[in-house]
A protein has these predicted regions:
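Core SAM-dependent methyltransferase catalytic element
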Residues: 178-180, 184-209
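Class I SAM-dependent methyltransferase SAM/SAH-binding core
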Residues: 43-94
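Conserved class I S-adenosyl-L-methionine
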Residues: 135-158
C-alpha cells in the first residue's frame, strides 16, 4: 500500500498531462457514465486528480471522490468548482462509509493496480446499495499490441504498480467470479484497451456495446 501511494504521490503533478493522450477514450467513457449517475449519489475510489468526477458531477446529486494518495487529492481540489463534489483521502479497502450508502460506485483504472482486487470489490459491495451500479472501467493490458506490451513493460520498469494483466474477457470474467453481473461492457480504444464495465449485485443479461 505504501509503495503504491508513494508512486502516485510522486507523479500527481504530471498525471493530467500523462492522461491527455487518452482524452478521446475518456470523453466516450464520460458519455457512458453520465446517464448512470444522473440524479444519483456517487462514490468514486481511486479518483486520482478527479478527471472523471469533475466531468460527470453536473449529472449527479453528489459525488464523494476518494484516493489513497494525499498529493493526488491536493491536485484534485485545486480547480474543483462544484459544491456537489467532495474530495478526501481514503483507503478503498477500508472505506469510512456506512453499508449501502451509495447508488453508484466508480472504480476506474483501479483494480489492475492494487494487490487483492477482489478485496476492494468486497468493500465496494458493502457501501453500494443493493440495486446500485458499479462502474469499473479498467485498462486491460494483456489484450494489447506488441508496442503496447512494450510500453507496459517500460512503465513497470519505471515503478508503475501493475498487479493484474487481464484481457478484456479475463477482466469481465474476474468481475463475474467475484459476485458481479456485468450488465454492459465496451472496449474503448486508448493507449491500452480500456474495458468499460457496468455491474450490479444481481444476476442479469450482459449487454456488449
Amino acid at each position: 500500500m505504501h509503495e503504491r501511494k508513494g508512486f502516485w504521490d510522486k507523479n500527481a503533478g504530471r498525471y493530467d498531462r500523462f492522461m491527455r493522450k487518452d482524452q478521446a477514450a475518456y470523453e466516450k467513457m464520460y458519455e457512458l457514465i453520465r446517464p448512470v449517475v444522473k440524479a444519483k449519489t456517487v462514490l468514486e475510489v481511486a479518483t486520482g486528480t478527479g478527471l472523471i468526477a469533475k466531468s460527470i458531477v453536473d449529472a449527479a446529486v453528489h459525488i464523494e471522490a476518494t484516493d489513497a494518495s494525499a498529493q493526488m487529492i491536493l491536485e484534485a481540489k485545486r480547480d474543483n468548482q462544484s459544491a456537489k463534489l467532495h474530495f478526501s483521502v481514503q483507503d478503498m479497502f477500508r472505506l469510512p462509509y456506512a453499508q449501502k450508502s451509495f447508488e453508484v460506485v466508480i472504480a476506474s483504472n483501479a483494480l489492475h493496480i492494487v494487490p487483492h482486487p477482489e478485496k476492494a470489490l468486497q468493500e465496494i459491495r458493502r457501501v453500494l446499495k443493493d440495486d446500485g451500479v458499479l462502474i469499473a472501467p479498467t485498462f486491460t493490458h494483456a489484450g494489447n499490441s506488441v508496442s503496447g506490451k512494450a510500453k507496459a513493460f517500460f512503465m513497470s520498469m519505471a515503478g508503475f504498480p501493475l498487479h493484474s494483466r487481464w484481457t478484456s474477457e479475463e477482466y469481465l470474467r474476474f468481475l463475474r467470479q467475484n459476485g458481479w453481473a456485468v450488465q454492459k461492457s465496451a472496449v474503448l480504444k486508448a493507449s491500452f484497451p480500456l474495458t468499460y464495465a457496468e455491474c450490479t449485485k444481481s444476476e442479469g443479461p450482459d449487454v456488449v456495446l
